[in-house]
Amino acid sequence: MIIATLLLTTASTALATASLNDRHSGSEVVSETTRYEDGPMAGGWWTRGKSGSNLISEYKHYTKEGRGSCRNGNATFSDGGWKPAETWSKSKVGYTLLGGNKVYYDYK
């Protein structure tokens, strides 16, 4: 019984680790001096930064599902959702002047 439980626990841990490793992501902190940027990133295209009074993150992967998201200094989070290859995932929140603004991309 103990061996069966140990094997089941080990298998569950391996599956959880594998699913976490299937995700690929990146992030950047956006400050008042950070410019709005866009360019190639991890097999796709990432547009991010401060746009007017908003913090944005838009990501599309060319061959896999992609997602853009952002969080401001008030912990307001916006998730563009998982989108199929070649489709933009767009997120936007209000930019906070006191910092804590961060943008993310992810693909799987």
List the model feature ranges, each with a label:
Residues 1-40:
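N-terminal prepro-regions of secreted/extracellular proteins
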